[in-house]
Design a protein with these regions (language model features):
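An N-terminal-biased, well-structured beta-alpha scaffold segment characteristic
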Residues: 1-92
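Short beta->alpha junction loops/turns
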Residues: 11, 73, 96-99, 151
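Rossmann-fold NAD(P)-dependent oxidoreductase module
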Residues: 21, 105, 109, 157, ...
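Phosphate-binding beta-alpha-beta segment of Rossmann-like dinucleotide-binding domains, i.e.
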Residues: 86-145
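Rossmann-like dinucleotide/phosphate-binding beta-alpha-beta segment
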Residues: 135-174
Length: 174
């Protein structure tokens, strides 16, 4: 028994790499790319899995579809339309896969601003050489409190980084 997986949308080089890796890892997996509407309607008739965005018209021939992989962590408004919600299709997304990367990036900014690097970088760029190191707006992080607004995956990972730097952390989820 084979499993047919369809990528909806245009080929971009990355998708082909994923498809190759998927086919090598999963014996019997058939991967298709459907960028044109007519081809999407045909390929979805036998598909068990799909990556992309469906609409009402594309859902009609997708009788065998069991899994829809959303192309974003937070799909746009209208992605989950009533017919899709009422179907037996399992929908997954990227939620959580960037928590560590984004929280590390946030901490890079916290460290930069806490040491006044944004001022020094601007001065250096403008060839402004001053002896203002002793007047640096440095903030000692263990004496600071971080307010995390939104304690989902990224907020929780950021809170953990802040704790590692000795900060008091307050998290709220609006």
């Amino acid at each position: 028994m084979s499993f047919k997986f369809v990528f909806l949308g245009k080929k971009d080089g990355i998708i082909e790499k994923y498809a190759t890796a998927m086919q090598e890892a999963v014996p019997g997996l058939e991967v298709y790319f459907a960028s044109e509407r007519d081809q999407q309607l045909v390929d979805l008739t036998e598909a068990s899995g799909c990556f992309g965005t469906l609409d009402k018209e594309l859902l009609v021939p997708a009788k065998k579809l069991e899994w829809l992989a959303a192309p974003a962590a937070g799909p746009p408004r209208g992605y989950y339309f009533p017919e899709l919600i009422e179907s037996n299709i399992q929908v997954t997304n990227f939620r959580g896969i960037f928590n560590d990367h984004i929280s590390s990036h946030i901490m890079a900014f916290v460290l930069c601003f806490s040491r006044g690097m944004h001022v020094f970088f601007a001065d250096q760029f403008n060839q402004k050489w001053t002896n203002s190191g002793e007047k640096s707006p440095a903030v000692h992080l263990p004496e600071s409190t971080a307010l995390i607004v939104g304690v989902g995956g990224i907020g929780a990972a950021t809170a953990l980084h802040c704790k590692h730097f000795g900060m008091e952390v307050i998290g709220i989820d609006p």
